[in-house]
Amino acid sequence: MASHQSEKEKPQSCTTEVQVSHVTGLKLGLVVTSVTLVVFLMLLDMSIIVTAIPHITAQFHSLGDVGWYGSAYLLSSCALQPLAGKLYTLLTLKYTFLAFLGVFEVGSALCGAARCSTMLIVGRAVAGMGGSGLTNGAITILASAAPKQQQPLLIGIMMGLSQIAIVCGPLLGGAFTQHASWRWCFYINLPVGALAAILLLAIHIPKSVPTSDCTMPAPRAVGVRVILSQLDLLGFVLFAAFAVMISLALEWGGSDYMWDSSVIIGLFCGAGISLVVFGFWERYVGNSMAMIPFSVASRRQVWCSCLFLGFFSGALLTFSYYLPIYFQAVKDVSPTMSGVYMLPGIGGQIVMAIVSGAIIGKTGYYIPWALASGIIVSISAGLVSTFQPHTSIAAWVMYQFMGGFGRGCGMQTPIIAIQHALPPQMSALGISLAMFGQTFGGSLFLTLAKLVFSAGLDAGLREYAPAVSAEAVTAAGATGFRDVVPANLLSQVLLAYCKGIDHTFYLAVGASGATFLFAWGMGQVGLIWWGEERTGFGRDERV
Protein backbone atom coordinates (compact mmCIF):
# COMPACT_ATOMS: atom_id res chain seq x y z
CA MET A 1 0.00 0.00 0.00
CA ALA A 2 2.76 2.40 1.00
CA SER A 3 4.79 1.55 -2.06
CA HIS A 4 1.71 2.03 -4.22
CA GLN A 5 1.13 5.48 -2.71
CA SER A 6 4.77 6.41 -3.14
CA GLU A 7 4.69 5.32 -6.75
CA LYS A 8 1.50 7.26 -7.33
CA GLU A 9 2.89 10.44 -5.82
CA LYS A 10 6.20 10.28 -7.62
CA PRO A 11 6.30 13.03 -10.24
CA GLN A 12 6.55 11.79 -13.72
CA SER A 13 9.21 13.01 -16.04
CA CYS A 14 8.20 15.21 -18.87
CA THR A 15 8.87 13.79 -22.23
CA THR A 16 8.18 16.87 -24.26
CA GLU A 17 8.52 20.55 -23.65
CA VAL A 18 6.72 23.52 -25.02
CA GLN A 19 8.72 25.09 -27.77
CA VAL A 20 9.70 28.56 -26.62
CA SER A 21 11.41 31.49 -28.22
CA HIS A 22 14.07 32.62 -25.78
CA VAL A 23 14.99 36.23 -25.23
CA THR A 24 18.16 37.22 -27.09
CA GLY A 25 20.47 40.15 -27.68
CA LEU A 26 19.76 43.50 -26.07
CA LYS A 27 16.48 42.30 -24.56
CA LEU A 28 18.27 39.48 -22.75
CA GLY A 29 20.83 41.96 -21.48
CA LEU A 30 18.02 44.14 -20.12
CA VAL A 31 16.44 41.15 -18.39
CA VAL A 32 19.75 40.27 -16.72
CA THR A 33 20.28 43.91 -15.74
CA SER A 34 16.78 44.17 -14.27
CA VAL A 35 16.88 41.06 -12.11
CA THR A 36 20.45 41.80 -11.01
CA LEU A 37 19.36 45.27 -9.87
CA VAL A 38 16.48 43.78 -7.91
CA VAL A 39 18.60 41.16 -6.15
CA PHE A 40 21.26 43.81 -5.51
CA LEU A 41 18.63 46.00 -3.84
CA MET A 42 17.39 43.12 -1.71
CA LEU A 43 20.89 42.30 -0.44
CA LEU A 44 21.64 46.00 -0.01
CA ASP A 45 18.52 46.41 2.12
CA MET A 46 19.77 43.67 4.44
CA SER A 47 23.18 45.29 5.01
CA ILE A 48 22.71 49.04 4.55
CA ILE A 49 20.84 49.50 7.82
CA VAL A 50 23.83 48.46 9.94
CA THR A 51 25.53 51.86 9.96
CA ALA A 52 22.21 53.74 10.16
CA ILE A 53 20.99 52.03 13.34
CA PRO A 54 22.76 54.40 15.81
CA HIS A 55 21.06 57.43 14.24
CA ILE A 56 17.68 55.66 14.05
CA THR A 57 17.78 54.69 17.72
CA ALA A 58 18.83 58.22 18.67
CA GLN A 59 15.90 59.78 16.78
CA PHE A 60 13.26 57.30 17.96
CA HIS A 61 14.79 56.66 21.43
CA SER A 62 14.47 52.97 20.64
CA LEU A 63 17.70 51.27 21.64
CA GLY A 64 15.72 48.29 22.90
CA ASP A 65 14.27 47.71 19.41
CA VAL A 66 17.62 47.34 17.63
CA GLY A 67 17.33 43.57 17.29
CA TRP A 68 13.92 43.85 15.63
CA TYR A 69 15.23 46.05 12.80
CA GLY A 70 17.05 43.05 11.41
CA SER A 71 14.95 40.17 12.70
CA ALA A 72 11.62 41.56 11.41
CA TYR A 73 12.96 41.31 7.86
CA LEU A 74 14.50 37.90 8.46
CA LEU A 75 11.38 36.42 10.08
CA SER A 76 8.97 37.38 7.31
CA SER A 77 11.42 36.44 4.56
CA CYS A 78 12.21 32.98 5.95
CA ALA A 79 8.56 32.19 6.66
CA LEU A 80 7.37 33.06 3.15
CA GLN A 81 10.14 31.62 0.96
CA PRO A 82 8.56 28.18 0.35
CA LEU A 83 5.17 29.81 -0.29
CA ALA A 84 6.84 32.10 -2.82
CA GLY A 85 8.16 29.05 -4.65
CA LYS A 86 4.65 27.58 -4.74
CA LEU A 87 3.22 30.81 -6.16
CA TYR A 88 5.74 30.75 -9.01
CA THR A 89 4.37 27.33 -10.04
CA LEU A 90 0.77 28.60 -10.08
CA LEU A 91 0.93 32.12 -11.49
CA THR A 92 2.47 33.97 -14.41
CA LEU A 93 6.20 34.28 -13.74
CA LYS A 94 6.87 37.91 -14.60
CA TYR A 95 3.87 39.40 -12.82
CA THR A 96 4.41 37.29 -9.72
CA PHE A 97 7.98 38.59 -9.57
CA LEU A 98 6.77 42.17 -10.02
CA ALA A 99 4.21 41.65 -7.25
CA PHE A 100 6.95 40.59 -4.83
CA LEU A 101 9.01 43.58 -5.97
CA GLY A 102 6.01 45.84 -5.34
CA VAL A 103 5.61 44.53 -1.79
CA PHE A 104 9.34 45.05 -1.22
CA GLU A 105 9.04 48.64 -2.47
CA VAL A 106 6.04 49.31 -0.21
CA GLY A 107 8.06 48.06 2.75
CA SER A 108 10.97 50.30 1.79
CA ALA A 109 8.64 53.30 1.52
CA LEU A 110 7.20 52.56 4.96
CA CYS A 111 10.69 52.36 6.45
CA GLY A 112 11.75 55.62 4.83
CA ALA A 113 8.62 57.43 5.99
CA ALA A 114 8.61 55.90 9.48
CA ARG A 115 7.58 58.28 12.26
CA CYS A 116 8.22 55.84 15.08
CA SER A 117 10.16 52.67 15.76
CA THR A 118 7.05 50.47 15.45
CA MET A 119 6.35 51.79 11.95
CA LEU A 120 9.94 51.06 10.95
CA ILE A 121 9.69 47.48 12.24
CA VAL A 122 6.44 46.95 10.33
CA GLY A 123 8.10 48.32 7.20
CA ARG A 124 11.01 45.93 7.62
CA ALA A 125 8.60 43.01 7.94
CA VAL A 126 6.73 44.06 4.79
CA ALA A 127 10.02 44.43 2.90
CA GLY A 128 10.99 40.93 4.03
CA MET A 129 7.70 39.57 2.68
CA GLY A 130 8.53 41.04 -0.71
CA GLY A 131 12.15 39.97 -0.57
CA SER A 132 11.15 36.35 0.05
CA GLY A 133 10.34 35.86 -3.63
CA LEU A 134 12.94 38.02 -5.36
CA THR A 135 16.05 35.84 -5.64
CA ASN A 136 13.97 32.77 -6.44
CA GLY A 137 12.01 34.72 -9.04
CA ALA A 138 15.12 36.26 -10.58
CA ILE A 139 16.72 32.86 -11.12
CA THR A 140 13.47 31.44 -12.49
CA ILE A 141 13.15 34.36 -14.92
CA LEU A 142 16.68 33.75 -16.21
CA ALA A 143 15.86 30.06 -16.61
CA SER A 144 12.79 30.98 -18.63
CA ALA A 145 14.43 33.68 -20.73
CA ALA A 146 17.63 31.90 -21.81
CA PRO A 147 18.57 28.42 -23.05
CA LYS A 148 20.21 26.09 -20.53
CA GLN A 149 23.69 26.49 -21.97
CA GLN A 150 23.59 30.24 -21.22
CA GLN A 151 22.01 30.03 -17.78
CA PRO A 152 25.19 29.29 -15.73
CA LEU A 153 26.88 32.40 -17.16
CA LEU A 154 23.84 34.61 -16.58
CA ILE A 155 23.24 33.30 -13.07
CA GLY A 156 26.94 33.79 -12.33
CA ILE A 157 26.76 37.40 -13.52
CA MET A 158 23.65 38.08 -11.46
CA MET A 159 24.92 36.44 -8.26
CA GLY A 160 28.46 37.75 -8.58
CA LEU A 161 27.45 41.38 -9.12
CA SER A 162 24.59 41.42 -6.63
CA GLN A 163 26.82 40.12 -3.81
CA ILE A 164 28.69 43.43 -3.94
CA ALA A 165 25.75 44.86 -2.00
CA ILE A 166 26.75 42.95 1.14
CA VAL A 167 29.98 44.95 1.33
CA CYS A 168 28.68 48.22 -0.17
CA GLY A 169 25.65 48.35 2.11
CA PRO A 170 27.37 49.62 5.27
CA LEU A 171 29.39 52.12 3.22
CA LEU A 172 26.32 53.56 1.48
CA GLY A 173 24.42 53.54 4.76
CA GLY A 174 27.15 55.57 6.40
CA ALA A 175 27.29 58.01 3.48
CA PHE A 176 23.52 58.55 3.41
CA THR A 177 23.34 58.93 7.18
CA GLN A 178 26.22 61.38 7.31
CA HIS A 179 25.47 63.54 4.27
CA ALA A 180 21.68 63.23 3.78
CA SER A 181 19.41 61.20 6.07
CA TRP A 182 19.13 57.61 7.21
CA ARG A 183 15.76 57.54 5.43
CA TRP A 184 17.57 57.43 2.09
CA CYS A 185 18.88 54.01 3.05
CA PHE A 186 15.35 52.88 2.20
CA TYR A 187 14.20 55.49 -0.30
CA ILE A 188 17.04 54.50 -2.65
CA ASN A 189 15.16 51.28 -3.35
CA LEU A 190 12.20 53.10 -4.88
CA PRO A 191 13.67 54.62 -8.08
CA VAL A 192 16.02 51.71 -8.77
CA GLY A 193 13.25 49.16 -8.22
CA ALA A 194 10.89 51.17 -10.44
CA LEU A 195 13.49 51.20 -13.23
CA ALA A 196 13.89 47.42 -13.01
CA ALA A 197 10.11 46.97 -13.10
CA ILE A 198 9.74 49.17 -16.18
CA LEU A 199 12.42 47.20 -18.03
CA LEU A 200 10.75 43.88 -17.21
CA LEU A 201 7.30 45.15 -18.19
CA ALA A 202 8.64 46.16 -21.59
CA ILE A 203 10.05 42.70 -22.37
CA HIS A 204 8.11 39.52 -23.05
CA ILE A 205 9.45 36.67 -20.90
CA PRO A 206 8.42 33.25 -22.25
CA LYS A 207 7.29 30.31 -20.13
CA SER A 208 9.55 27.31 -20.66
CA VAL A 209 7.21 24.74 -19.12
CA PRO A 210 6.85 21.05 -19.96
CA THR A 211 3.54 19.51 -20.97
CA SER A 212 0.83 18.93 -18.41
CA ASP A 213 1.55 15.24 -17.85
CA CYS A 214 3.75 16.32 -14.93
CA THR A 215 2.47 16.57 -11.39
CA MET A 216 2.67 20.31 -10.99
CA PRO A 217 0.52 22.55 -13.16
CA ALA A 218 2.06 25.04 -15.51
CA PRO A 219 2.11 28.70 -14.47
CA ARG A 220 -1.10 30.31 -15.60
CA ALA A 221 -3.67 32.97 -14.87
CA VAL A 222 -6.13 31.46 -12.39
CA GLY A 223 -8.83 32.68 -10.05
CA VAL A 224 -8.31 33.48 -6.38
CA ARG A 225 -10.37 30.48 -5.27
CA VAL A 226 -8.24 28.10 -7.35
CA ILE A 227 -5.04 29.66 -6.03
CA LEU A 228 -6.15 29.29 -2.41
CA SER A 229 -7.09 25.67 -2.99
CA GLN A 230 -3.57 24.94 -4.31
CA LEU A 231 -1.53 26.88 -1.74
CA ASP A 232 -1.53 24.41 1.18
CA LEU A 233 -2.25 27.13 3.73
CA LEU A 234 -2.01 24.79 6.72
CA GLY A 235 1.42 23.71 5.53
CA PHE A 236 2.39 27.36 5.23
CA VAL A 237 1.22 28.09 8.79
CA LEU A 238 3.20 25.14 10.18
CA PHE A 239 6.36 26.06 8.27
CA ALA A 240 6.01 29.75 9.18
CA ALA A 241 5.72 28.78 12.85
CA PHE A 242 8.94 26.77 12.56
CA ALA A 243 10.78 29.58 10.73
CA VAL A 244 9.65 32.28 13.17
CA MET A 245 10.45 30.31 16.32
CA ILE A 246 13.88 29.10 15.17
CA SER A 247 14.80 32.60 13.96
CA LEU A 248 13.70 34.20 17.24
CA ALA A 249 15.66 31.62 19.22
CA LEU A 250 18.80 32.43 17.25
CA GLU A 251 18.18 36.18 17.47
CA TRP A 252 17.44 36.30 21.21
CA GLY A 253 19.76 33.56 22.44
CA GLY A 254 22.79 34.88 24.28
CA SER A 255 21.63 38.52 24.10
CA ASP A 256 18.05 39.08 25.30
CA TYR A 257 17.86 35.69 27.03
CA MET A 258 20.34 33.11 28.24
CA TRP A 259 20.60 30.02 26.04
CA ASP A 260 19.32 27.82 28.86
CA SER A 261 16.34 30.08 29.63
CA SER A 262 12.81 28.73 29.36
CA VAL A 263 12.04 31.14 26.51
CA ILE A 264 14.86 29.93 24.25
CA ILE A 265 14.32 26.26 25.11
CA GLY A 266 10.60 26.69 24.46
CA LEU A 267 11.26 28.30 21.08
CA PHE A 268 13.59 25.49 20.02
CA CYS A 269 11.12 22.83 21.16
CA GLY A 270 8.22 24.59 19.45
CA ALA A 271 10.22 24.90 16.25
CA GLY A 272 11.08 21.21 16.31
CA ILE A 273 7.48 20.16 16.90
CA SER A 274 6.23 22.45 14.12
CA LEU A 275 8.77 21.04 11.69
CA VAL A 276 7.85 17.43 12.50
CA VAL A 277 4.11 18.11 12.14
CA PHE A 278 4.79 20.01 8.91
CA GLY A 279 6.68 17.02 7.50
CA PHE A 280 3.84 14.62 8.32
CA TRP A 281 1.27 17.02 6.86
CA GLU A 282 3.16 17.48 3.59
CA ARG A 283 3.50 13.72 3.26
CA TYR A 284 -0.22 13.31 3.94
CA VAL A 285 -1.49 15.83 1.38
CA GLY A 286 0.75 14.44 -1.37
CA ASN A 287 2.98 15.96 -4.02
CA SER A 288 0.26 17.68 -6.02
CA MET A 289 -1.01 19.78 -3.07
CA ALA A 290 1.97 20.12 -0.72
CA MET A 291 3.73 23.47 -0.40
CA ILE A 292 7.02 21.56 -0.39
CA PRO A 293 6.38 18.24 -2.17
CA PHE A 294 8.18 15.36 -0.48
CA SER A 295 9.41 14.20 -3.89
CA VAL A 296 11.22 17.54 -4.22
CA ALA A 297 12.64 17.89 -0.70
CA SER A 298 13.81 14.26 -0.59
CA ARG A 299 15.81 14.51 -3.80
CA ARG A 300 19.49 14.05 -2.97
CA GLN A 301 20.53 16.84 -5.32
CA VAL A 302 18.00 19.22 -3.76
CA TRP A 303 18.76 18.74 -0.07
CA CYS A 304 22.51 18.57 -0.70
CA SER A 305 22.26 21.82 -2.68
CA CYS A 306 20.28 23.48 0.13
CA LEU A 307 22.85 22.44 2.72
CA PHE A 308 25.70 23.48 0.41
CA LEU A 309 24.15 26.93 0.04
CA GLY A 310 23.48 27.24 3.78
CA PHE A 311 27.10 26.53 4.69
CA PHE A 312 28.31 28.64 1.74
CA SER A 313 26.26 31.58 3.04
CA GLY A 314 27.66 31.06 6.53
CA ALA A 315 31.24 31.29 5.25
CA LEU A 316 30.43 34.27 3.01
CA LEU A 317 28.82 36.29 5.80
CA THR A 318 31.67 35.50 8.17
CA PHE A 319 34.06 37.09 5.67
CA SER A 320 31.67 40.00 5.03
CA TYR A 321 31.04 40.85 8.70
CA TYR A 322 34.36 40.15 10.42
CA LEU A 323 36.94 41.34 7.89
CA PRO A 324 35.63 44.93 8.25
CA ILE A 325 35.94 44.53 12.03
CA TYR A 326 39.57 43.47 11.57
CA PHE A 327 40.35 46.44 9.34
CA GLN A 328 38.52 49.02 11.46
CA ALA A 329 39.38 47.71 14.93
CA VAL A 330 42.88 46.33 14.40
CA LYS A 331 44.17 48.28 11.40
CA ASP A 332 42.38 51.46 12.59
CA VAL A 333 41.00 52.51 9.20
CA SER A 334 37.72 54.28 8.44
CA PRO A 335 34.58 52.39 7.38
CA THR A 336 35.09 53.69 3.85
CA MET A 337 38.66 52.42 3.69
CA SER A 338 37.66 49.08 5.15
CA GLY A 339 35.30 48.74 2.19
CA VAL A 340 38.18 49.56 -0.15
CA TYR A 341 40.32 46.93 1.57
CA MET A 342 37.58 44.36 0.84
CA LEU A 343 37.84 44.89 -2.92
CA PRO A 344 40.30 42.01 -3.58
CA GLY A 345 37.73 39.50 -2.36
CA ILE A 346 34.90 41.15 -4.28
CA GLY A 347 36.97 41.32 -7.46
CA GLY A 348 37.96 37.66 -7.31
CA GLN A 349 34.37 36.66 -6.64
CA ILE A 350 32.91 38.60 -9.58
CA VAL A 351 35.55 37.46 -12.05
CA MET A 352 35.28 33.78 -11.16
CA ALA A 353 31.47 33.80 -10.95
CA ILE A 354 31.39 34.96 -14.57
CA VAL A 355 34.28 32.78 -15.78
CA SER A 356 33.02 29.61 -14.08
CA GLY A 357 29.50 30.28 -15.33
CA ALA A 358 30.74 30.62 -18.89
CA ILE A 359 32.81 27.42 -18.69
CA ILE A 360 29.95 25.46 -17.11
CA GLY A 361 27.69 26.66 -19.89
CA LYS A 362 30.18 25.41 -22.50
CA THR A 363 31.15 22.09 -20.90
CA GLY A 364 28.21 21.20 -18.65
CA TYR A 365 30.47 20.18 -15.75
CA TYR A 366 29.47 21.94 -12.52
CA ILE A 367 30.41 19.55 -9.67
CA PRO A 368 34.19 20.10 -10.05
CA TRP A 369 33.62 23.83 -9.55
CA ALA A 370 31.63 23.21 -6.36
CA LEU A 371 34.37 20.93 -5.04
CA ALA A 372 37.07 23.46 -5.91
CA SER A 373 35.07 26.18 -4.16
CA GLY A 374 34.97 24.25 -0.90
CA ILE A 375 38.71 23.57 -0.98
CA ILE A 376 39.81 27.09 -1.95
CA VAL A 377 37.53 28.95 0.48
CA SER A 378 38.58 26.62 3.32
CA ILE A 379 42.25 27.40 2.63
CA SER A 380 41.50 31.12 2.38
CA ALA A 381 39.59 31.16 5.68
CA GLY A 382 42.41 29.23 7.32
CA LEU A 383 44.93 31.79 6.11
CA VAL A 384 42.74 34.70 7.24
CA SER A 385 42.59 33.10 10.70
CA THR A 386 46.33 33.84 11.00
CA PHE A 387 45.81 37.62 10.77
CA GLN A 388 47.73 39.67 13.33
CA PRO A 389 48.01 43.44 13.91
CA HIS A 390 51.04 43.66 11.63
CA THR A 391 49.91 41.33 8.83
CA SER A 392 51.27 42.71 5.56
CA ILE A 393 49.19 44.25 2.79
CA ALA A 394 50.30 41.55 0.35
CA ALA A 395 49.04 38.83 2.70
CA TRP A 396 45.55 40.19 3.31
CA VAL A 397 45.12 41.08 -0.37
CA MET A 398 46.07 37.59 -1.56
CA TYR A 399 44.12 35.74 1.13
CA GLN A 400 40.99 37.74 0.36
CA PHE A 401 41.39 37.30 -3.39
CA MET A 402 41.71 33.56 -2.87
CA GLY A 403 38.46 33.52 -0.88
CA GLY A 404 36.63 35.52 -3.52
CA PHE A 405 38.07 33.28 -6.24
CA GLY A 406 36.74 30.21 -4.44
CA ARG A 407 33.31 31.69 -3.76
CA GLY A 408 32.99 32.70 -7.40
CA CYS A 409 33.72 29.13 -8.46
CA GLY A 410 30.83 27.63 -6.52
CA MET A 411 28.15 30.22 -5.85
CA GLN A 412 25.84 29.25 -8.74
CA THR A 413 26.45 25.48 -8.69
CA PRO A 414 23.66 24.54 -6.21
CA ILE A 415 21.13 26.40 -8.35
CA ILE A 416 22.31 24.55 -11.45
CA ALA A 417 22.13 21.24 -9.58
CA ILE A 418 18.51 21.88 -8.57
CA GLN A 419 17.54 22.96 -12.08
CA HIS A 420 19.06 19.75 -13.42
CA ALA A 421 17.42 17.50 -10.83
CA LEU A 422 13.86 18.80 -11.18
CA PRO A 423 11.46 19.37 -14.08
CA PRO A 424 11.32 23.06 -15.07
CA GLN A 425 7.89 23.66 -13.53
CA MET A 426 9.17 22.31 -10.17
CA SER A 427 12.50 24.15 -10.12
CA ALA A 428 10.99 27.23 -8.44
CA LEU A 429 10.03 25.04 -5.47
CA GLY A 430 13.55 23.63 -5.23
CA ILE A 431 15.14 27.05 -5.56
CA SER A 432 12.86 28.44 -2.84
CA LEU A 433 14.16 25.73 -0.51
CA ALA A 434 17.72 26.68 -1.46
CA MET A 435 16.99 30.34 -0.69
CA PHE A 436 15.61 29.35 2.72
CA GLY A 437 18.76 27.31 3.31
CA GLN A 438 20.87 30.32 2.36
CA THR A 439 18.96 32.69 4.66
CA PHE A 440 18.75 30.28 7.57
CA GLY A 441 22.36 29.14 7.20
CA GLY A 442 23.61 32.71 7.15
CA SER A 443 21.57 33.59 10.24
CA LEU A 444 22.76 30.51 12.10
CA PHE A 445 26.43 31.13 11.36
CA LEU A 446 26.23 34.82 12.26
CA THR A 447 24.82 33.80 15.63
CA LEU A 448 27.58 31.23 16.10
CA ALA A 449 30.21 33.71 14.91
CA LYS A 450 29.01 36.28 17.45
CA LEU A 451 29.39 33.75 20.26
CA VAL A 452 32.80 32.55 19.07
CA PHE A 453 34.10 36.10 18.62
CA SER A 454 32.95 37.16 22.10
CA ALA A 455 34.49 34.08 23.69
CA GLY A 456 37.73 34.53 21.76
CA LEU A 457 37.96 38.22 22.65
CA ASP A 458 37.37 37.50 26.34
CA ALA A 459 40.00 34.75 26.29
CA GLY A 460 42.42 37.03 24.48
CA LEU A 461 41.95 39.83 26.99
CA ARG A 462 42.58 37.43 29.88
CA GLU A 463 45.72 36.16 28.14
CA TYR A 464 47.24 39.36 26.73
CA ALA A 465 45.68 42.21 28.76
CA PRO A 466 44.37 40.91 32.10
CA ALA A 467 44.44 44.43 33.55
CA VAL A 468 41.88 45.69 30.99
CA SER A 469 38.17 45.41 31.70
CA ALA A 470 36.58 43.08 29.17
CA GLU A 471 33.18 44.68 29.84
CA ALA A 472 34.54 48.15 29.03
CA VAL A 473 36.16 46.97 25.78
CA THR A 474 33.02 45.17 24.66
CA ALA A 475 30.73 48.07 25.56
CA ALA A 476 32.92 50.55 23.67
CA GLY A 477 32.56 48.59 20.43
CA ALA A 478 34.99 47.75 17.67
CA THR A 479 35.73 51.38 16.80
CA GLY A 480 35.53 52.91 20.28
CA PHE A 481 37.66 50.70 22.48
CA ARG A 482 40.79 52.76 21.73
CA ASP A 483 39.24 55.59 23.75
CA VAL A 484 38.90 53.46 26.90
CA VAL A 485 42.13 51.44 26.72
CA PRO A 486 45.38 52.94 28.10
CA ALA A 487 47.93 53.60 25.36
CA ASN A 488 50.50 51.27 26.91
CA LEU A 489 48.02 48.36 26.78
CA LEU A 490 46.60 49.00 23.30
CA SER A 491 48.92 46.56 21.52
CA GLN A 492 47.86 43.75 23.87
CA VAL A 493 44.16 44.52 23.30
CA LEU A 494 44.75 44.43 19.54
CA LEU A 495 46.18 40.93 19.96
CA ALA A 496 43.05 39.97 21.88
CA TYR A 497 40.86 41.35 19.09
CA CYS A 498 42.85 39.34 16.55
CA LYS A 499 42.32 36.22 18.60
CA GLY A 500 38.56 36.73 18.60
CA ILE A 501 38.50 37.37 14.85
CA ASP A 502 40.84 34.46 14.11
CA HIS A 503 38.64 32.05 16.06
CA THR A 504 35.63 33.27 14.11
CA PHE A 505 37.27 32.26 10.85
CA TYR A 506 37.67 28.73 12.14
CA LEU A 507 33.90 28.60 11.66
CA ALA A 508 34.35 29.67 8.04
CA VAL A 509 36.89 26.87 7.57
CA GLY A 510 34.38 24.35 8.87
CA ALA A 511 31.51 25.77 6.81
CA SER A 512 33.57 25.70 3.63
CA GLY A 513 34.70 22.16 4.36
CA ALA A 514 31.03 21.18 4.70
CA THR A 515 30.30 22.63 1.24
CA PHE A 516 33.00 20.33 -0.17
CA LEU A 517 31.28 17.31 1.37
CA PHE A 518 27.77 18.22 0.23
CA ALA A 519 29.00 19.07 -3.27
CA TRP A 520 29.47 15.32 -3.86
CA GLY A 521 25.73 14.85 -3.45
CA MET A 522 24.71 17.52 -5.95
CA GLY A 523 25.08 15.28 -9.01
CA GLN A 524 27.65 13.36 -11.02
CA VAL A 525 31.17 14.65 -11.48
CA GLY A 526 31.01 13.79 -15.17
CA LEU A 527 27.62 15.14 -16.16
CA ILE A 528 26.46 17.34 -18.98
CA TRP A 529 23.87 19.19 -16.97
CA TRP A 530 21.50 20.03 -19.82
CA GLY A 531 20.68 16.39 -20.40
CA GLU A 532 23.50 14.25 -21.80
CA GLU A 533 25.05 11.94 -19.21
CA ARG A 534 28.64 10.69 -19.18
CA THR A 535 30.44 8.19 -17.00
CA GLY A 536 31.29 9.80 -13.69
CA PHE A 537 30.92 9.59 -9.93
CA GLY A 538 27.92 7.40 -9.07
CA ARG A 539 24.60 7.31 -10.81
CA ASP A 540 22.61 10.48 -11.15
CA GLU A 541 19.00 10.51 -9.94
CA ARG A 542 16.47 12.08 -12.26
CA VAL A 543 12.90 13.07 -11.57
Curated annotation (Swiss-Prot):
Per its UniProt record, what InterPro entries does this chain match? MFS, MFS_dom, MFS_trans_sf
Q: List the transmembrane segments.
A: 30-50, 90-110, 125-145, 153-173, 185-205, 233-253, 261-281, 307-327, 340-360, 364-384, 394-416, 428-448, 509-529
Specify the protein's topology with respect to the membrane: Multi-pass membrane protein
**Biotech and industrial use:** Monacoline K acts as an inhibitor of HMG-CoA reductase involved in cholesterogenesis. Its hypocholesterolemic activity might be useful for lowering cholesterol levels in the blood and reduce artherosclerosis and coronary heart disease.
What is its induction behaviour?
Expression is controlled by the monacolin K cluster transcription regulator mokH.
Tell me the GO molecular function terms: transmembrane transporter activity
Gene Ontology cellular component annotations, sorted alphabetically: plasma membrane
The protein's predominant localisation is: membrane
Output this protein's name. Answer: Efflux pump mokI
- Originating organism: Monascus pilosus (Red mold)
- Upper lineage: Eukaryota, Fungi, Dikarya, Ascomycota, Pezizomycotina
